[in-house]
UniProtKB/Swiss-Prot annotation:
Protein task: Small adapter protein that modulate the activity of plastid Clp protease system (CLPC). Probably involved in substrate selection for plastid CLPC.
Keyword Chloroplast found: yes
Family: Belongs to the ClpS family.
Entry's localization field: Plastid, Chloroplast stroma
Top-rank taxon, per record: Eukaryota
First and last residue of the signal peptide: none
Region annotated Disordered, chain positions: 67-92
Name of this chain's protein: ATP-dependent Clp protease adapter protein CLPS2, chloroplastic
UniProt record, GO biological process: proteolysis
A GO cellular component entry from the record: chloroplast stroma
């Protein structure tokens, strides 16, 4: 093995250890609920108890069926079922607001590039309606999509607003 001399102000007998003699040890980290080669179980499996009891018929014992439930943080309440809005945050309207900075060409280009399913005729109609009434509905989308459209239209310097769409049943 070849060792190199240290260039520091130490006695002449000190040498730097060769790179081969350095050993690295890998740390073994175990998960909280096991550490075997297989993955951990996240949810309880669906188990039919009647098959586990040797095939006995439990229907005459009036035992309610067991439903596998996961903890959703609601302390057992069914707040998800009580909601009247569809999943995804509900529908929102993307409104084009009237602004003296808007030009028809710029608004048409922005709307047709950002909002899918729009054409130049629809964009021109939105521009004319916003000039006449002060605002126009560009599209209706889920909240997350509507926020994305608003952010992208903002990059084109188009003033927009969002409002919940309560007209759909």
């Amino acid at each position: 093995m070849l060792a190199t001399r240290c260039k520091c102000n130490l006695p002449s007998r000190s040498f730097v250890a060769p790179a081969r003699s350095v050993r690295t040890r890998a740390l073994h980290v175990e998960g909280r609920f096991g550490g075997g080669r297989g993955g951990n179980v996240i949810d309880r499996p669906d188990v039919d108890v009647s098959k586990r009891l040797g095939g006995f018929d439990l229907s005459d014992w009036n035992i309610p069926s067991w439903d596998a439930k996961t903890d959703n943080g609601n302390n057992g309440s069914n707040t998800d079922k009580d909601k009247k809005s569809p999943p995804g945050g509900g529908n929102y309207r993307v409104l084009l607001l009237d602004s003296p900075q808007h030009t028809e060409k710029g608004v048409v280009a922005a709307i047709t590039r950002v909002v899918p399913g729009t054409n130049p005729d629809h964009a021109r109609n939105c521009f004319a309606t916003s000039k006449q009434l002060g605002m126009a509905i560009i599209t209706t989308a889920l909240k997350e999509h509507a926020e994305l459209y608003r952010e992208q239209l903002f990059t084109y310097r188009v003033r927009t607003a969002l409002e919940p769409d309560n007209s759909t049943v």
